[in-house]
Amino acid sequence: GIASRGLGDVYKRQDMNFKAEDIINKNFDGFFLSNGPGDPKKVYENIKPELNKLLNKKIPTFGICLGHQILSLAFNASTARMEKGHRGGNHPVKNLETNKVEITSQNHGFVVLDENFPSNLQITHKSLFDKTIDGMKANDQPLFSVQYHPESSPGPHDSRYLFDEFINLMEKNAG
């Protein structure tokens, strides 16, 4: 994960009461929106004003699981409860940019919908089980997310490259 990449200062909030100014004023190189429980629509509504302030600053951003769903909602995508959630390891996901298959760990009961997917986002990953959206990136800012847990990577570390991509995005944005 991020900690194993030797990053310096990390600002951590474990609730939804963060203030965008706390992150912006400290000039952090990136913003990581992690996983968590709950309905993404309800969580997004609680953090929408602060999250939008961050997104407007175009700070490099990486989201996983619930973070993926929330970022998708911030760009006007839709989410829905799944009939059967994705739980456990060994979920094959196709990276549409490389055409490689990654074996992922997943634990979610909501999904980002293909229907009316925003044109300012690009789908980057799809589940090979049910073709649901498992990754996206923004076309006009340094932001990407995945539905699964790259920090778990039950395969031979199939998805850990995403943390390197996030670091590269932060370095590129800083320079």
Label every model-predicted segment.
Residues G1-Y11:
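Single conserved hydrophobic/aromatic residue that forms the stacking wall/gate
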Residues R5, E21-K26:
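Pre-Walker A segment
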Residues D9, R13, F117-N120:
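Acyltransferase
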Residues R13-D22, D39-P40:
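Short acidic loop-to-helix transition motifs that present clustered carboxylates
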Residues Q14, M82, T124-K126, M136, ...:
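Hydrophobic residues at beta-strand termini and immediately following loops
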Residues I24-D114, G155-L169:
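Cysteine-nucleophile active-site neighborhood
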Residues N99-P142:
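Catalytic beta-strand/loop cores that center a nucleophilic Ser/Cys/Thr
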Residues G135-G175:
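A glycine-centered loop/beta-turn motif at secondary-structure junctions
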